[in-house]
Amino acid sequence: MAKIKAEYIWIDGHSPTPKLRSKTKIIDGPVSELSQIPEWSFDGSSTLQGVGHNSDRAMRPVDFVPDPIRGGEHILVMTEVNYPDSTPHKTNKRVNLVDVVKRHLAHEAWFGIEQEYTFFRGRSPLGWPEGGYPAPQGPFYCGVGADEVFGRDIVERHLDACLYSGIGISGVN
C-alpha cells in the first residue's frame, strides 16, 4: 500500500472571523472512502479552542477531495472539531447546519458559492491609496482591466484548483 499526504483542514476558534488551519498526516492510500481516513488531533490552545491543561481536540473527517496542489493520490480532508469524547466542540458550527439541513430536506435548498477576494500589501488592501480608501465600489465591482482588478492570475488558479478537486463553486467575482 502506498503512503499519501492527507492535509487535514479545520476551522479555528477566532472570533468574530474564524481562520482556517491545516496540518499534514501520512496515511495509507489511495483513499476511496471516508472511512479510510483516521481521526486525528491537534493542540486547541494554539487555535483558541482549548486551554493549556486540557487542549487536545479531535478532527473528525467529514469529506475529502483530491489535493490540487500536490496532485497524485494526495487528498485534502475537511474535518469538524470535537472534544476528545467525540462531542462537538463549541466552535463546531457545522453540526448545527447538518441538523437544519436534515430537518428541511423536503425544501431542497440550493446554494451557490461564489468566491470573492481581497488581496493585501502589508496591512492595506492591494490597490488602495496609502492610509486611505479607494473610490466607491461601483467602478471596480466585477471590473475588467489592470486599473480595476488585481490578482486575476491567482483567482484563475484558485478556480481551476476547485474544479480539479470537485469542490462545488459556481463562479468568482
Where are each of the predicted segments found?
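Glycine-rich, acidic/polar active-site loops that bind/position phosphate-bearing ligands
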Residues: M1-N173
